Design a protein with these regions (language model features):
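RecB-family 4Fe-4S metal-dependent nuclease core
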Residues: 1-289
């Protein structure tokens, strides 16, 4: 029976987390601190950088084309960064923060000099969080926020554009664009004729991607989502590395052990923590010689 309040909601980030480490997925997406009844979130410098840049660039899609650059983008970035400065962004020293902030400023300057699709018509899906029923029978919903939809008036079609702030390129097996393609096809009426990444850290132009087959993508994603639902029903989310953990779940285990510092709550009331890696090394991580 389908019920969006009891359904399993899956997204690109939650599916990726599950595939990397079921334990990490559980701690990041399902677990709630019994003391606060809030989910937990770990803030880090790369996450802060991505959040600040995305906030600036994505906000432009809500503004009319001829007014998008009326306010200097670097001023917008400065406002976004202030919310993430210091420990709020996972920065424990000024030098590290300066490096990340400078990278963010360079990305914004790149957008100013080479606005590309940001200077053209865009489509905004009228949903705070685009979603659709991946399977009503299995009570599974697919959701996700799309960075940018470029509109082509001649063909009345759209191009999905995803902004990347990481220095690493997405692999060919990434499910991100296939998921976004499904969402856009189900949440608005225009055909998707192109998909691209924009690597803001290194490129002035879009990097086109192959348009995935909708049916094949949906079948693949539903298969993974069913595994996620089964493991949730069993309450079984084990790390592939066993009790020693992995890079995906260890940082969240540190929160549970009281080794992380609480810095506040995000817009969704999650408890946000930061981890100073240099001060949280356990004795087993070092040897006295």
């Amino acid at each position: 029976m389908s019920d969006k309040y009891t359904a399993l909601w899956v997204s690109h980030s939650s599916i990726s987390a599950f595939l990397e480490c079921p334990r990490g997925y559980f701690l990041k997406n399902i677990y709630k601190d019994p003391k606060t009844n809030h989910k937990i979130k770990l803030m880090s410098p790369p996450l802060a950088l991505g959040q600040a840049v995305h906030e600036v660039v994505e906000s432009l899609s809500e503004i009319k084309t001829d007014l998008r650059f009326s306010e200097p983008l670097l001023d917008k970035f400065e406002r976004s960064w202030k919310k993430l400065s210091g420990k709020n962004g996972g920065f424990f020293d000024k030098e590290t923060e300066f490096k990340y902030k400078s990278r963010g400023e360079e990305m914004v300057r790149r957008v100013i000099k080479n606005p590309g699709p940001l200077n053209e018509l865009a489509v905004k899906i009228n949903m705070d969080l685009p979603y659709y029923w991946l399977s009503e029978e299995d009570n599974i919903i697919l959701c996700g926020k799309i960075d940018w939809l470029k509109y082509y008036p001649d063909s009345d079609s759209v191009e999905i554009i995803d902004f990347k702030t990481s220095r690493h390129e997405e692999g060919e097996d990434s499910l991100q664009l296939p998921i976004y393609n499904l969402l856009v096809n189900h949440c608005q009426n225009r055909e998707v004729t192109a998909l691209s990444y924009w690597y803001l850290d290194s490129s002035d132009e879009l990097t086109p991607q192959k348009v995935p087959n909708l049916k094949e993508a949906e079948e693949k994603i539903l298969k993974i989502a069913k595994r996620m639902k089964l493991q949730k029903s069993l309450g079984k989310f084990d790390c592939p590395n066993g009790e020693s953990g992995c890079r995906a779940c260890r940082p969240f285990e540190s929160i549970l052990k009281g080794e992380a510092e609480f810095v506040g709550n995000d817009d969704f009331k999650a408890d946000v923590y930061v981890l100073n890696k240099t001060s949280t090394l356990s004795e087993k991580d070092s040897t006295i010689l």
